UniProtKB/Swiss-Prot annotation:
Participates in transcription elongation, termination and antitermination. This is Transcription termination/antitermination protein NusG. Residues 18-49 form the KOW domain. CDD domains: KOW_NusG. It comes from the Bacteria. GO terms for biological process: DNA-templated transcription termination; regulation of DNA-templated transcription elongation; transcription antitermination. It holds the Pfam family KOW. The gene is nusG.
Amino acid sequence: NQVEAAVQRPVSSVFFEVGERVCVSDGPFASFNGIVKNVDEEKSRVHVEVVIFGRVTPVELAYNQVEKIV
């Protein structure tokens, strides 16, 4: 049931915006900085471009794997 699924899905209090600079805090790309290219609020995921070995690499991460850079 979609209503039950929506109730069980944790809601993040952190909101990301396209173009925002973030730091990856968890996973294989931890400590890399990147730029948010897309936000999927339904799945609580962000698409971030990070520079790895001099190349821009798109990665998809959960909200809890990135932190805003202030």
